[in-house]
């Protein structure tokens, strides 16, 4: 469960490594949630590939690593991208793990480009509030429900746009690798 990953991220990244509540700690926690999904779909993609692909490449004189890089990975890219899309979709809506690791807001200054400043938008060590945390906070605190609904709609649109973009990229890579 993501709440357990959030507590794990808090203990490891904030307490043990001393990162503090930051974008980096949140990204590392969400990446822990993404690893099983991406690993499982990648393993399924490799196991679903016909064995003669690799054998044919080796038979033509390619080394094992050349076969993996030039045959196996390109043939598996569409299914691997599916895992990335699923993991990213989960990461977009993640609130529990981020609650413990990113903080709950920051005062950004869009004209401040000093990377060490906590108000710089590009500083990965600054606290941050994600859209999913904002939705959670608005619902829990009973503030403006219309703002919470608008934030949820924006989050769904962002996930949809990411999925469309990732699918287009996957189709492009597949078309490029198939020779059409």
What are these model-predicted stretches?
Residues 24, 31, 35, 53, ...:
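Alpha-helical membrane-protein architecture signal
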Residues 12-13, 27-38, 88-92, 102-107, ...:
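Hydrophobic transmembrane alpha-helices
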Residues 1-30:
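Generic hydrophobic transmembrane alpha-helix motif, especially the helices
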Residues 99-156:
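Interhelical loop and adjacent transmembrane-helix boundary motif
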Residues 170-180:
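Short cytosolic juxtamembrane segments of multi-pass membrane proteins
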Residues 25, 32-53, 81, 85, ...:
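Membrane-embedded alpha-helices of multi-pass transport/permease systems
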Residues 41-42, 64-102:
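Transmembrane alpha-helices
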Residues 1, 60-61, 74:
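Glycine/proline-centered hinge or cleavage motifs at structural transition points of membrane proteins
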């Amino acid at each position: 469960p993501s709440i357990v990953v959030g507590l794990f991220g808090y203990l490891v990244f904030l307490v043990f490594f001393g990162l503090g509540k930051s974008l980096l700690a949140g990204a590392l926690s969400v990446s822990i949630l993404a690893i099983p999904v991406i690993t499982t779909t990648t393993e399924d993609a490799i196991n679903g590939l016909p064995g003669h692909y690799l054998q044919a490449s080796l038979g033509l004189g390619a080394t094992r690593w050349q076969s993996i890089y030039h045959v196996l990975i390109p043939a598996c890219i569409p299914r691997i991208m599916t895992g990335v899309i699923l993991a990213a979709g989960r990461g977009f809506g993640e609130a529990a793990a981020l609650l413990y690791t990113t903080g709950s807001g920051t005062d950004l200054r869009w004209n401040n480009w000093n990377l060490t400043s906590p108000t710089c938008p590009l500083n990965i060590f600054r606290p941050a509030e994600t859209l999913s945390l904002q939705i959670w906070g608005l619902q829990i605190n009973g503030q403006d429900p219309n703002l919470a609904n608008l934030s949820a709609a924006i989050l769904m649109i962002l996930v949809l746009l990411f999925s469309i973009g990732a699918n287009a990229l996957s189709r492009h890579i597949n078309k490029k690798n198939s020779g059409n």
